[in-house]
C-alpha cells in the first residue's frame, strides 16, 4: 500500500478487523481522519483541468496555494450548528494547521508536519455536553485540501490500510479505538452524490476519563476532486451508535454540499 505507482481504488466491500478497543476521545484518527506517514509519491499523474469528477468544478475556483486552501476550508468545515441542536465547541476548538495526526508503526497517533502533498488541513472539535444521565459525546470535523486528486485518493487508500494494520489504535494516553469495521461504498447510489469515494468505519471507543467503555465510535471519510472531508463521533455512557451516526452524517453531508458550492461552475 505504501508504493505509489498507479493507484486504483476498487471499492472495498467489507473489512472486519477484531481489536481490543481502549480509551480514545480526543483527536488522533478522528481529528485528522487519516494522517498516517505516507511515502512521498514518485511520479505524479498529470490531471486535466476539466477532469473534475462528480462535482462539475470550475478549475479557476480550485485552490492552488496553502492560503487559498485554508480560505476554502473555512467556508466548508463544520461549526456546532452543522451537527444539530445541543452541540457546542470543545477546547481546543481548532487544530494547528501546521500539524496533523500520523499513525506510527506502534499504532499510536502523534502530531507531525503534514505531507508535502497537502496544501492545507484543519480539524475542529465539538461535544454534546453530559446531561440526563448521558456522558459527553465528542465529535470532530476535518477538511483536507491535497495538491492533486490522486493525493486525495491515496489518503482514502491509506485509511483502509491503517485499519487493517492497526485494529486497535491509541489516540492519546487513555484513549483507544478498536474492533473496527470499515466499509468503502464508492459511488453507490444513495451514498453521497457529490463524493467520488466514501469510507465508513465503526467500532469501539474507550476513554479512561469517561469510565472506560467501550462506547460506540463512527468515522466518515469522503473524497471528491483533491479534497477529503471527515467527521468522527465518539460515544459515552448512554449514547447509541444510531444517535452518533445521526449527528455525524448531518455534518458530513452538509460539508460535502458546501464543498460543491465552493468550487462548482457557476451559471
What are these regions (language model features)?
Residues 1-10:
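N-terminal export and membrane-targeting signals
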Amino acid at each position: 500500500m505504501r508504493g505509489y505507482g498507479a493507484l486504483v481504488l476498487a471499492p472495498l466491500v467489507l473489512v472486519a478487523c477484531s481489536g481490543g478497543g481502549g480509551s480514545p476521545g480526543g483527536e488522533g484518527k478522528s481529528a485528522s481522519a487519516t494522517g498516517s506517514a505516507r511515502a512521498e509519491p514518485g511520479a505524479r499523474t498529470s490531471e486535466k483541468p476539466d477532469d473534475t469528477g462528480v462535482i462539475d468544478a470550475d478549475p479557476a475556483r480550485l485552490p492552488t496555494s496553502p492560503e487559498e486552501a485554508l480560505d476554502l476550508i473555512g467556508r466548508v468545515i463544520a461549526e456546532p450548528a452543522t451537527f444539530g441542536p445541543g452541540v457546542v465547541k470543545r477546547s481546543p476548538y481548532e487544530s494547528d494547521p501546521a500539524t496533523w495526526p500520523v499513525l506510527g508503526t506502534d499504532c499510536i497517533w502523534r502530531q507531525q508536519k503534514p505531507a508535502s502533498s497537502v496544501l492545507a488541513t484543519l480539524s475542529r472539535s465539538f461535544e454534546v455536553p453530559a446531561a440526563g444521565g448521558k456522558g459527553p459525546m465528542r465529535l470532530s470535523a476535518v477538511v483536507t485540501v491535497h495538491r492533486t486528486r490522486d493525493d486525495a485518493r491515496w489518503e482514502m487508500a491509506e485509511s483502509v490500510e491503517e485499519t487493517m494494520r492497526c485494529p486497535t489504535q491509541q489516540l492519546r494516553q487513555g484513549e483507544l479505538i478498536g474492533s473496527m469495521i470499515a466499509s468503502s461504498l464508492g459511488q453507490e447510489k444513495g451514498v453521497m452524490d457529490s463524493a467520488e469515494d466514501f469510507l465508513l468505519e465503526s467500532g469501539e471507543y474507550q476513554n479512561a476519563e469517561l469510565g472506560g467503555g467501550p462506547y460506540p465510535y463512527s468515522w466518515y471519510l469522503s473524497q471528491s476532486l483533491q479534497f477529503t472531508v471527515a467527521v468522527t463521533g465518539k460515544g459515552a455512557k448512554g449514547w447509541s451508535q444510531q444517535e452518533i451516526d445521526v449527528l455525524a452524517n448531518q455534518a458530513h453531508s452538509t460539508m460535502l454540499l458546501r464543498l460543491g458550492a465552493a468550487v462548482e461552475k457557476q451559471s
